[in-house]
């Protein structure tokens, strides 16, 4: 681990928490040319869902940073970096959509980031196969979570839907990459604990 790498990851972490992440791909757009009008209630609900998604991407940045820093494999470092760059797009897209909805990111982003970073370090210290298994299980749970949001988003909110659909496609790809790279299936207690932690995060971030 070199000093330059630590500085780079520290900068990425600050940008993730502050909501000023860079995007390498443009914000996904729906096929319809003109956005539909949302009621006040629909905007509030869509904003809550997109705030949850934004928090998920803050956590993803922390997890991948920790896993990248704790592996000694150059190939896995590159895989985690590639996934982190795509997740950084998600972070920027959801922040952009929150602004469009006249809303804001979670006030607890520093807490979410710190917790995810600690979990990522623990997963990384348990070895590459466990770390990759953790990545695969995380992506499976995120995929399920995004499926739920696609059914919950207001029918008229095509802009948020386009973003979530592309995020879902990327998460599926990341999960498959982790499994193909040798990730093991985590034991049921670990998967249940991850779901419980995710439920606390999503139910809180919707409002805060």
Curated annotation (Swiss-Prot):
Pfam families: COQ7 (PF03232). InterPro entries: COQ7_proteobact, Ferritin-like, Ferritin-like_SF, Ubq_synth_Coq7. Signal peptide: none annotated. Pathway: Cofactor biosynthesis; ubiquinone biosynthesis. It catalyses: a 5-methoxy-2-methyl-3-(all-trans-polyprenyl)benzene-1,4-diol + AH2 + O2 = a 3-demethylubiquinol + A + H2O. One of its GO terms (cellular component) is plasma membrane. Binds 2 iron ions per subunit. Its cofactor is Fe cation. Its EC number is 1.14.99.60. Keywords: Cell membrane, Iron, Membrane, Metal-binding, Monooxygenase, Oxidoreductase, Ubiquinone biosynthesis. GO terms for biological process: ubiquinone biosynthetic process. One of its GO terms (molecular function) is 3-demethoxyubiquinol 3-hydroxylase activity. It is found in: Cell membrane. Its main location: membrane. The keyword Oxidoreductase applies. Fe cation 1 binds at residues 57, 87, 90, 171. Belongs to the COQ7 family. HAMAP family: COQ7. Catalyzes the hydroxylation of 2-nonaprenyl-3-methyl-6-methoxy-1,4-benzoquinol during ubiquinone biosynthesis. NCBIfam families: DMQ_monoox_COQ7 (NF033656). This is 3-demethoxyubiquinol 3-hydroxylase. The gene is coq7.
